[in-house]
């Protein structure tokens, strides 16, 4: 274990911040492995980080590649299985509901039928609820004004268009459909199932 470092000079602060950011990437990988049911030996992992920085690796390049590729293959298999299970869950959850549009694993579902179609320049208020499929909130409910145009983000554009004025649309999807990998919140993994509810009013 490295000795405690003084964090006083600009160089020390910059270096410390770099270390924290690096560790956040490692923690994200560990959370994914745990969610896939894979065990991790944290002591060995930290030893690998320290040995790499110190230039004293205990494996040659061939051994490193073989072991890392074996882990990556195992993670890939389990992740694919998790996505397959999730897609099946989405399909069973949406059975009997009115699916207005499907884009791969993203489903736009009618909850409340709207009235007039929405046109460019319309001023609207959108109420958004974000939750997991089991109903647990991912973020606080919020309402926001918007001027409708073709340039607003895809999911918002489609939800508003399909909901129409006075309507409500639910969007069911994987977390990875909504977030790029580098922006995924720490509380989520890519194959978590989410539900977004968009209610549109004037």
Model-based region annotation:
Residues 1-202:
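Cross-family detector of peptidyl-prolyl cis-trans isomerase
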């Amino acid at each position: 274990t490295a000795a405690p470092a003084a964090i006083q000079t600009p160089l020390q602060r910059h270096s410390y911040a770099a270390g924290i950011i690096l560790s956040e990437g490692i923690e994200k990988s560990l959370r994914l492995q745990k969610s896939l049911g894979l065990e991790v030996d944290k002591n060995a992992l930290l030893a690998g980080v320290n040995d790499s920085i110190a230039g004293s690796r205990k494996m040659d390049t061939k051994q490193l590649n073989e072991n890392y590729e074996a882990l990556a293959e195992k993670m890939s298999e389990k992740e694919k299985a998790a996505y397959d299970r999730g897609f099946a869950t989405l399909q069973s959850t949406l059975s009997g509901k009115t699916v207005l549009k499907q884009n791969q694993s993203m489903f736009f579902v009618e909850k409340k039928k709207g009235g007039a179609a929405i046109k460019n320049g319309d001023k609207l208020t959108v109420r958004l609820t974000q939750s997991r499929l089991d109903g647990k909130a991912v973020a606080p409910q919020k309402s926001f004004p918007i001027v409708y145009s073709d340039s607003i983000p895809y999911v918002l554009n489609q939800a508003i268009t399909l909901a129409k004025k006075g309507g409500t649309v639910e969007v069911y999807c994987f977390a990875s459909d909504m977030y790029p990998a580098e922006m995924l919140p720490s509380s989520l993994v890519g194959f978590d199932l989410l539900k977004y509810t968009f209610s549109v009013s004037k």
